[in-house]
Amino acid sequence: MTASVAAAPDPAGLDPELAHIAPALKAEILAQALPYIRKFHGKTIVIKYGGNAMTEEKLKHGFARDVILLKLVGMNPVVVHGGGPQIDDALKKVGKTGTFIQGMRVTDEETMEVVEWVLGGEVQQDIVMLINQYGGQAVGLTGKDGGLIRAKKLKMPDREQPGQFIDIGFVGDIETINPAVVRALQDDAFIPVISPIGFSDDGQAYNINADVVAGKMAEILKAEKLVMMTNIPGVMDKQGNLLTDLSAREIDELFADGTISGGMLPKISSALDAAKSGVNSVHIIDGRIEHSLLLEILTEQAFGTMIRSH
């Protein structure tokens, strides 16, 4: 078998669309980023990477470059990735369709095998490869590596029958996270790329929602910032307007009236839990916008939805 090796991208061509910008303006843009570079220097930034940013080629390459830039200016990015569309595609090939309850994928034994293969293999390897091709040093991890994520079977409350629980298969609830694994990589200048798969003490694999893993990882690592990339501008009200700032009380109201539902339930719950645990800055942003990660971290531009604990 002949191994295929992708050619490293030409650094001179990383952002050809910027070629027309005057040098003075480029310098001004960099100068505006300086206060944020100072603010987050040496800090851990947890990034939930998902949605179109993972499937559109231009956005994928842009994300890899953005993560490397954050590392080069002294931040410690930690990437937790999803892969819902890729899992759905793989399930179709074996004649299965995805089913979700309260934003969580119902995961039988066959689906769990697909999830492990897709997330811990194909998707993770693609992210690691791109970051490394652009000059970064990324290392892929699952929950099994170094006992990173210990999990147990999730007991999902049945909202229609109080006191009852819904069995959604091999979906995990995080018991512990071993921060030493991630910190050891950070100390050696690596960028951790984490697949949201946990393992029990007896070796059973569990599918864990990536938003849940990102939020808990931010808490345990004492991250300065948690950024969740998604396929919408942020949290929207029922009229489709962007809510730029949400408190815990406002989030409870949006849960109660059904404004937040489906896949946004675990996302917002995890974001709020992270904010309550001491993560100073929690944002949900539109990953469909090029360089949205840099815009959120390195500029004053109001972007997405900020989640507050009070």
UniProtKB/Swiss-Prot annotation:
Catalytic activity: N-acetyl-L-glutamate + ATP = N-acetyl-L-glutamyl 5-phosphate + ADP
Any one of the GO CC terms: cytoplasm
GO function terms (MF aspect): acetylglutamate kinase activity; ATP binding
Entry keyword annotation includes Repressor: no
Pathway the protein contributes to: Amino-acid biosynthesis; L-arginine biosynthesis; N(2)-acetyl-L-ornithine from L-glutamate: step 2/4
Function: Catalyzes the ATP-dependent phosphorylation of N-acetyl-L-glutamate.
Alphabetized HAMAP family for the sequence: ArgB
Protein name: Acetylglutamate kinase
Species of origin: Ralstonia nicotianae (strain ATCC BAA-1114 / GMI1000) (Ralstonia solanacearum)
Lineage: Bacteria, Pseudomonadati, Pseudomonadota, Betaproteobacteria, Burkholderiales
